Swiss-Prot record:
Gene3D superfamilies: 3.40.50.360
UniProt KW keywords: 4Fe-4S, Antibiotic biosynthesis, Flavoprotein, FMN, Iron, Iron-sulfur, Metal-binding, Oxidoreductase
Official protein name in the record: 2-amino-4-deoxychorismate dehydrogenase
UniProt source species: Streptomyces globisporus
EC number: 1.3.8.16
One GO process term, biological-process aspect: antibiotic biosynthetic process
A GO molecular-function descriptor: 4 iron, 4 sulfur cluster binding
Cofactor or coenzyme needed: [4Fe-4S] cluster
């Protein structure tokens, strides 16, 4: 019997508010399908901003800043699916999530793309404006990491202002439920493929990452 499948949610909100409520809703949907669901609240993680070293495009190894980001990255690598959830602040992605995708992406994930072929889901929470823009940014980040995005109909954008408003957005929560259901379907399909074929290299690539071969790149292939 295979191990229990897991979805990890990254909560990019600075407070225990509407985004957290939406993820609790998502957790119930996943758990009803027998999937383990864990939410990581970035507000509880010690996370430094990028430092002044400026060597991100030259270093061939992981970032040396000592904080909680590597632990979260390890959880992501161990999960079968990952949900990126963030509220809209100032017409853009909340600063905690923005800092995390910069630190995790440039500092750890770009070297060998360890999130390749994991199933991704995107949720944005907004009063009214820029929900689509934040959803799109997080979607591009998932695609950059070679993750699998499963279409779920309307994007999982939830509208809310005051605490508790997210749970009143019936259409938004329906879209979140559909997202989690479809993610679970794909995770189960990939798990079945691995068990039946004995292969773990679903959608294998012969590139370490897309940076190889670029001019002025620290990972440029040697002749």
């Amino acid at each position: 019997m295979s191990a229990q499948l897991k979805i990890l949610a990254i909560n990019g909100s600075e407070r225990d508010g509407n985004t957290a409520d939406v993820l609790r809703h998502a957790a119930r949907v996943a758990e009803n399908r027998g999937v383990d669901f864990e939410a990581v609240d970035l507000r509880s993680i010690r996370m430094e901003r990028c430092g002044p070293c400026g060597d991100c495009n030259d270093r061939p190894v992981a970032c040396t800043l000592a904080d909680g980001v590597p632990e979260v990255v390890a959880k992501m690598v161990a999960a079968d699916g990952i949900i990126f959830a963030a509220p809209v602040h100032g017409f853009g992605t909340a600063s905690l999530m923005q800092t995390f995708i910069e630190r995790a992406g440039v500092g750890y994930l770009r070297f060998d793309r360890p999130l390749s072929n994991k199933v991704a889901g995107i949720i944005s929470v907004a009063r009214r404006y820029s929900a689509g823009e934040v959803w799109a940014q997080l979607t591009v980040n998932a695609l950059l990491n070679r993750m699998i995005l499963v279409g779920s109909g309307f994007p999982a954008t939830v509208h809310a202002l005051h605490r508790g408003d997210a749970l009143k957005d019936e259409e938004g929560l329906t879209n979140v439920s559909r997202l989690v259901e479809r993610m679970t379907d794909m995770i189960e399909l990939l798990d079945e493929h691995r068990r039946l074929t004995g292969r773990s290299d679903v959608l294998a690539s012969n590139e370490v990452n897309e940076r190889v071969g670029l001019a002025l790149n620290e990972l440029q292939a040697q002749p």
